[in-house]
Amino acid sequence: MERLASFGNDPFDKPPCRGCSSYLTEPYVKCAECGPPPFLLCLQCFTRGFEYKKHQSDHTYEIMTSDFPVLDPNWTAQEEMALLEAVMDCGFGNWQDVANQMCTKSKEECEKHYMKHFINNPLFASTLLNLKQAEEAQHNETAIPFHPADDPPRPTFDSLLSRDMAGYMPARARLSSRSFDNYAEWDLRDIDFVEDDSDILHALKIAVVDIYHSRFKREKTAGRKKIIRDHGLINLRKFQILERRYPKEVQDLYETMRRFARILGPVEHDKFIESHALEFELRREIKRLQEYRAAGITNFCSARTYDHLKKTRDEERLKRTMLSEVLQYIQDSSACQQWLSRQADIDSGPTPAAPIPSNSGRRSAPPLNLTGLPGTEKLNEKEKELCQMVRLVPGAYLEYKAALVNECNKQGGLRLAQARALIKIDVNKTRKIYDFLIREGYITKA
């Protein structure tokens, strides 16, 4: 009867919720990793991630409910248990009292269901036979064959292998009994208290003894062996290999949090590192998706093409040198002379931008109309005027501005040659953008 009562619908028959101590009603949650006794939570405490002692919010769980059919589509598991309880209370054949106790089924339904599924059902007979055979098989189990293990290493205490294993002795399956501060007694082994010592010498000897006691106490309270055992710090190379699988940012965090490992438990410490590693991966993935979105990419097929083209552009940018820029103007002597004069101006310092006379006789292009162009609302009036004069769309200007500002922050200043290396557009437009950003205080000249 006690076994059946644990499945009843009466909330007073079940333990209360461990979070709010309220009586549990179905459905409720049972932790699959904690217990016995079972760790039960109501849905409200489960949704807010209640944790208590060893129970964590990320444990696996089970939804406890009996509102589902088992033997008959019209009978729920809760009604099946209620029928069995009623038969045990009222006796077999007293179907009227059984129906009155159940309150949901008639006398005929209770009798028909019980006789069909519990008396005349061959499933239960075969189940009992299988249980009996399984019980007999447990007593006839053969012995498990054991094979001799490999001979464990036995390094000497002062060897390099022993230091790498933190003094662990595999043959004895325990750490060495020698202390990490094994030579602390050497400082006081020759101290001798005599009656004719001066007060200063006597106080000095007492201080040395106190220092020894403090070192001994620190060795005892530090619990180095316990930390080594709990965190599994036996194989140092194994931990170094595990650290290398993290990105550099997580490795720096791992190195910083190593000193706090003695405060946190081994599981909590690993969870902390893994959670930050997952956070870093999510941030990097979000940044990558934001880059795709800013480029107008809406599917991963286009994203693969974008990544391939971006990698190609980066490789070409690294191959570019000053010689390649000269070769662009080698066929036009006047253009080459202008480029050389601009490079000379870079070395001599900033000069007011002077219009370069054009021999082509062509008229200058009209200002660009920014109406309706994306990114215009992000510009101030001076930036809009600049984009109109150099005929540069706002989106491209914002991208060039961000690249120049970031490079200036990294280098502590920016030269015009560096700006031209970053922005592969007309050198005259680059010069105007560079001068404008310096004049407005966005960047500083190196």
From Swiss-Prot:
A zinc finger (ZZ-type) spans 12-69. The lineage of its organism: Eukaryota, Metazoa, Chordata, Craniata, Vertebrata. This is Transcriptional adapter 2-alpha. Pfam families: Myb_DNA-binding, SWIRM, TADA2A-like_3rd, ZZ_ADA2. Coiled coil: none annotated. Residues 359-446 form the SWIRM domain. Its main location: nucleus. Keywords: Chromosome, DNA-binding, Metal-binding, Nucleus, Transcription, Transcription regulation, Zinc, Zinc-finger. It comes from Gallus gallus. Zn(2+) 2 binds at C31, C34, H55, H59. Residues 70-122 form the SANT domain.
